[in-house]
Amino acid sequence: MNQLEQLRQFTTVVADTGDFQLMKQYTPQDATTNPSLILKAVQKPEYRHLLEKAVQDHHGNGGVDAVMDEVLIAFGCEILAIVPGRVSTEVDARLSFDTEASVAKARHLIQLYEQRGIARERVLIKIASTWEGIRAAEILQRDGIRCNMTLLFSLVQAVACAEAGAQLISPFVGRIFDWYKKQAGEQWDAAANGGDNDPGVRSVRQIYDYYKKFGYPTEVMGASFRSTTQILSLAGCDLLTISPELLEQLAAGQGPVAHKLSVDQAQAANIARIAADEPAFRWQLNEDAMATEKLAEGIRLFAADAVKLEKLIGEIAK
């Protein structure tokens, strides 16, 4: 049994890509997309037709915004024809500090899916884990619109998401690792900060243990991986979303995979509850330089890629 097959015994495997042709061979349960992955995919010749069709059908009716939504839905529907489970579709990162606009955009995306015969249960709406984004998720979840809280780098963000009733969170492993490695510079000790001691792995384990200790139903899906070592260090997490490149490495890997995270261990752990109301959330996030910087950077990067996609749409529409 290869490492991917072994991992599936403990964890739901999710494909992290907009390249739906590439994901087929790994038979993931779910798939996740984001603005950067969609931008990357539409620049490939085999997906160009989806962008061109969206422009042709919608540019005169709703402009660039309508085309952007149509592109997201087109990719989502193609992915849902491949995976048996759910697809994650992201709300524009430029709405990350606007609760009302995030709610409106999420409802519109779900409406577009439902018009194509896709049940809302098969869609997760991705929203950045800002205070405003978490409040949007709270409203949406009450409407039966399930949310995947992204750009999550800290325990306080995770606790606030769980208390808001979010369906799922995506704590980022690789970007946390990147931050600590960059801070350490030449002092970075790869051996001391690898495997179970990887700062990104430790963050997800802390969140997973907290959720299971206190009985939160919110699903934990580790995301943003730099290596198969990071992935295998989180075997047992509810879900892990993995790029095709790393799925390929796992499928070729033959070493044993150990069960790392478990509900029993988490429930037996000595963990204190933390406050996650607005003052506590803002203070704890502000105290965490890594989480503050990575959340801000992540929003900027996703927003920049949304702008690039808009420019691409504008060029095709001319």
Curated annotation (Swiss-Prot):
Pathway: Carbohydrate degradation; pentose phosphate pathway; D-glyceraldehyde 3-phosphate and beta-D-fructose 6-phosphate from D-ribose 5-phosphate and D-xylulose 5-phosphate (non-oxidative stage): step 2/3. GO terms for cellular component: cytoplasm. It is an enzyme of class 2 (transferase). It is found in: Cytoplasm. One of its GO terms (molecular function) is transaldolase activity. One of its GO terms (biological process) is carbohydrate metabolic process. The active site is at 126 (schiff-base intermediate with substrate). Its EC number is 2.2.1.2. Keywords: Cytoplasm, Pentose shunt, Schiff base, Transferase. It catalyses: D-sedoheptulose 7-phosphate + D-glyceraldehyde 3-phosphate = D-erythrose 4-phosphate + beta-D-fructose 6-phosphate. SUPFAM superfamilies: Aldolase. Coiled coil: none annotated. InterPro entries: Aldolase_TIM (IPR013785), TAL/FSA (IPR001585), Transaldolase_1 (IPR004730), Transaldolase_AS (IPR018225). NCBIfam families: PRK12346.1 (NF009001), talAB (TIGR00874). Belongs to the transaldolase family. Type 1 subfamily. Homodimer. Transaldolase is important for the balance of metabolites in the pentose-phosphate pathway. This is Transaldolase. It comes from Cupriavidus necator (strain ATCC 17699 / DSM 428 / KCTC 22496 / NCIMB 10442 / H16 / Stanier 337) (Ralstonia eutropha). The lineage of its organism: Bacteria, Pseudomonadati, Pseudomonadota, Betaproteobacteria, Burkholderiales.
